[in-house]
């Protein structure tokens, strides 16, 4: 969201965790992980800052944090699995990863669905960490879908802050 919000931002808290661990702020990372697990919705998703809508991207960024903290705080396992399973449930038969709401996205020039490529690494990492090969298989299917259908757009570095390049 942006600075006018005076609330904790779950998505950002999720991707802070690996950085906090890298810089030695273990206790803070553990606290963030505990908070994130406590606000996870029953279906496995995490919602926007206002807790109104579930988002694929936000959920995936939180999963990155839970993957990073898992060796230190194995109690996150259930939340990690629920989140991954929810993400898998957002994949269409052809391999497109769709979010239930695009309310915060604006038009395609502001936020492209291709940012979902950046959601695949936590599935791949969780697959290895939890011995769940179906997570990696699903992530590869999504990558194949976007590469097959959006190759030109993916290669256009001027769309949505280079997220896609980080994902590939």
Residue ranges and their predicted role:
Residues 1-168:
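Glycan-recognition and catalytic cores of secretory/periplasmic carbohydrate-active enzymes
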């Amino acid at each position: 969201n942006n600075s006018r919000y005076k609330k904790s931002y779950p998505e950002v808290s999720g991707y802070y965790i690996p950085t906090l661990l890298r810089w030695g702020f273990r206790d803070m990372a553990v606290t963030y992980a505990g908070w994130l697990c406590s606000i996870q919705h029953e279906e496995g998703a995490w919602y926007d800052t206002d807790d109104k809508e579930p988002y694929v991207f936000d959920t995936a960024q939180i999963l990155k944090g839970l993957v990073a903290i898992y060796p230190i705080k194995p109690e996150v396992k259930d939340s990690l699995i629920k989140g991954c399973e929810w993400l898998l449930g957002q994949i269409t038969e052809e391999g497109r990863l769709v979010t239930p709401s695009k309310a915060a996205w604006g038009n395609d020039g502001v936020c492209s669905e291709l940012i979902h490529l950046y959601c695949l690494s936590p599935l791949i990492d969780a697959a290895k960490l939890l011995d769940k090969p179906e997570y990696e298989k699903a992530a590869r299917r999504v990558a194949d879908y976007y590469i097959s259908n959006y190759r030109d757009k993916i290669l256009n570095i001027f769309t949505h802050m280079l997220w896609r390049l980080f994902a590939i």
